[in-house]
Amino acid sequence: MMCQGFTVVNSHVFDLPFNSILIVILFSDVDDGSTVTDFLPAERARGITIQSAAITFHWPPPPPDRNSAASLLAQASSQPSHTINLIDTPGHADFTFEVLRSLRILDGAVCILDGVAGVEAQTEKVWHQAANYRIPKIIYVNKLDRDGAAFGRTVKEIASRLHTWPAVCQIPWWEGGNGRFIGVGDVVALQGLRWTERDGKTVKAVSMDELATTTDQRFADEIRKARVALVELLSEYDDQMVEKYLECDEDHLAIQPWNIIESLRRCLLNSFSPLVPVYAGASFKNIGVQPLLDAVINILPSPREADDPEISIGTVNGGLKDLIHGKMSPEAPVCSPVKSKKAVVPARKSKTAIIGNLEACALAFKVVNDPRRGVLVYVRVYSGTINRNATLFNTNLQTSEKAPRLLRMYASDGIDIPAIPAGQIGVILGLKHTRTGDTLVSYIGSNPKTGPPAPLNTLQLRPIEVPPPVFFASIEPHSLSEEKPVADALALLLREDPSLRCSVDEESGQTLLSGMGELHLEIARDRLLQDFKAKASMGRVEIGYRECLLSPSSIETAMFERETAGRKGKAGCAASSAPFAGDEEALAAVATDTEYSSHQDGNRVKVSVVGSTGLAEETESSGSPLPPYLPLNAVYTALANGAFAALARGPRHSYAMYGTNVSVTLDPALHVFGNETTSGALSSAARLATQAALRNAAAQGGTAVMEPLMNVIISVEEASLGPVVHDISSARGGHISSLDDADVIEASMHGGKTREDQPFIDLRKVYAPPDPFAASLVVGGEDPGMPGSGNRQRSITAKVPLKEMVGYLKHLRSLTGGRGTFVMSVDRYERMGGQREKALLRELSGV
């Protein structure tokens, strides 16, 4: 509860007794490494959340004593105990996929803000990701007990940076107005809540009359002011609140607390309402945590009230609830006349029966390799119940697996359970093939091999989107014998974290591991070496440079003559090489009827046979200059393959060639020697002739080094635009292609909305209580949260050498205060500048 992440929850009424796990989570401390959900050694060592962790508890618990916070709140609400499935997610930008896969399966979210830092860069990013999934959210401003905490400023930043109207439901209670943080003012219930002990076990409810007469008159006045602002804001988006306001003779303070709670709930359930409840507290001292949990129960939706899960079945998209209730046809409608009603009714009943036998539907959102238990698959059940030993059909992989054991998780600990019902999160042990994002269904009477009948065997819940990687490093096994163990360990690591990607560079032979950032890969390396015991090291990425010719060569002739396995092979050919523009138009140039042309990796090879009239003669044996056992097509392919093999290694620096045109000529009278000339011999002759032509061209005009040029799209705030553009164009040798408003990028970040579609937030109308020493928060008379401070998003499109983009993410975050992001892809190869080429060659020679 006290991490600086984006905590996401789902809840539903479940009448079970409370157990002691709640006390552990409330009184753990991220600062000393005792947080229950931060159980990895790296998390405890660094004091941050690295991977999402699930924990299930009940709220409200049985009151331990009459004066406790839980007792006071339980007496006020008299509500049954609820089951809360809480997932603690990381706050660091490198672990954004952990947030994404958690957001995908939750019903509500609690956004925890640092009261000192305010709305940070990663907060904005995750907020928009949650909006993309239309998840109801509440905000908890934490760490108000620290020096420099400013609740009012944070509320203003919520409005300006998150583009939402903050509905302030609590205000901080500062002792004496400017002293230490001692409690909160409950704007909904019109009372003060003061935590009287340092550990937060005891809370005292102070009425408005007592506040006004004996304790703090200014604080009581501020609570009334906050109540007026809250009712006015709710009236803008909830007609029923307007009716209650009129029923109470337009008295904001006369409206009952439950009426305000119901109004807040209605606004949150409306995904188009730009309103978010805001609460205050200090988790280190346990101040405000219990009212926050009450808000989770009272305001956030239960699984029954959440949006219908998106599914695809066959070619049809829709909602899972609509499918189960018969409101969605599992097949696309066929526009054909119905000839007989009797022929239609049985088919309709058959479809209904098929859907009725669907026992459960769940989404696997996380896979973890536990050293003691094996592979743990975290699932969210959307429909029905998954029972122990049930046969689950994976509709993505079209395979069936047994679920021999089910667990309810408490961070790293698990308790065996007989079933996972709808709306719950659980863990399945024993699944060998299931991956993150796979849909699992249980069907009554299904065939274990073929699964449920069509079209239910194609039922898939909305998948989890994996962001593209932006940071790369190489993985090198310590020896050849360690290659397979390292590959197996990487496969386990990638199954756990799909945001990691593994690939093999065909030119360098390096195994490349890519991820979301430097810290992400650092943690992956530690897990690979320490948890999976892989014997490998992580190094830097080697850039795949290319070599190009600067002048054409003369025609070079080569003869190949060698005896292999007792059979003599002999052939010859002539070849010449020349530079050419390796663009699409040049590569797409069509050969004539008498020559063969092929292009590969930016190079082109043309093959001609003296005396040949083209492939058409292959059907006419007469008149061909080649012997019958050498088809013209086979000769073309063999010669081209030999030339391309020679182009894989340049004459000067051994880089692969790029932008090279090779012409290979075969004269059957000079280069074919009866049965000794085979396809293999021709290929070897073409390789030797091409290598000779490349050496000749290099001797006459030299070669140049080419480097991969990346197409980079950078999203930054306008205030950071100048430094980023200057860095790209000067320090990194890039070329700026365009500077645009980031409407397209914002549309993807804001759930399909551009900035013009976002609600206009007039900060003058946003209520925020005064902060202690508020004058020091405004510098030069400008509110940092006000519009016009340079927080408009801009998009930079540039062409930058790949070498300069290695490790760029960390530098970009430094330039933009953590608010810059980028994506890149290979655009083309470009010749290196003189100074850069000299530096590279010095590096290669070890000077």
What name fits each language-model region?
Residues T83, D107-A109, Y133-Y140, F272-P277, ...:
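Short, surface-exposed connector motifs at secondary-structure boundaries
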Residues A117-L358, A362:
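P-loop NTPase catalytic nucleotide-binding module
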Residues G33-S34, G47-S52, H92-V99, L103-L106, ...:
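Amphipathic alpha-helical transducer elements in NTP-driven molecular machines
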Residues E157, H163-V168, P172, N298-P301, ...:
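Accessory interaction regions appended to the cores of large information-processing enzymes
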